Amino acid sequence: MSASTNAHMRNFDSLTSGPLEPSAKKALTSLPDYAYFDSTKLYHESRSARMLLDSARASIAAILKVEPDEVSFIPSGNAGLDLIISGLLNASTTKKIISSSVEQKAIIERLKSFDSTLISVNNQARINEKEFIEKLESIKPSLAILQFSNHEVGTQQPIHPIYKKCQELNIPLFVDASMTAGLVNVGNDWDVLLLKPSSWGAPIGLDVLVVKKNIKFKSILLDDGRENHKFSSNIFIPQAVAIGASLEALNQKRGETAKSLSILIKDLREALEKIKNIIVLGDPVARLPHVLSFLIENVDGEFIAQNLSKKGFAVSSGSSCTPDAIKPSHVLSEMGYPNQAHIRVSLSFNTNKDDINDFVVALTQTLNEI
């Protein structure tokens, strides 16, 4: 990923998307012609294409320390989330779900179709761990859903104790790790895991779903065996190869990159806290290394985002789950900041100190123009 989307724009919205990581770009442009064949056929080119797809899947599995046949490529965004939740519940005799109240908007909306219980959060967007565990014990749902970290403010959730209780009660836990950008070790405290490759420099369009072998999953789509019975469609193999290649490249320098970005976020937090009327959101310590959100009291978020864009910075504003729209965030509302627009910064992998300093200057100038 690059800090600049062009000669003038610095990408401070890397969680949404950004330029391709070099190894991903190479995969898309240098693969042999057979990479574009249907991998389900029996002729030579098809078998060769299948080997490329299997290799990409295996490389992802090795990094996540799972088996290749537990890794599937699925549609990104709301379509993929719906596929996951529907597939898990379709395999269950009951339809009770426990989730946090600050999951992605698509998850919250999908859960309205089922018997769901949403667990409250504090003013940093961390769930009430005690309440979550008590509800697991009393309701005994067929599925628990919990984000690895919040998609808007970066706060990490207490995954381990929740997973431990789910294991005791034989309840599958679906962990949405789509905002970790490959920078955080997601460990093994989950039964179902979702990753978003576009956040680490792979092309937009496919997400990575990992379902452990002991977890029941029955796709709502016609099951023809493709993608480990999760998604009945041919996968664009160059994209799958790009996902695997970019994750491998990131994994080689993950610790160094995460540490560098965490320091920059700390510097940015300290600078923002000195600016009048700015409230910095999320946990200052237990957080994603590359994400920071803040709101500016009585200031329109759209105005800030547009003016920062004019000054060369791409940021996200409003609800991060709502495409191209400035709408109040359900996450901020749950945190105690109803009807407030906010700015989310998510740093690209090669963001540097000068970028942070320039951003603070641009933001200060924007506020002075109000």
Identify the function of each model-found stretch.
Residues M1-I370:
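Pyridoxal 5′-phosphate
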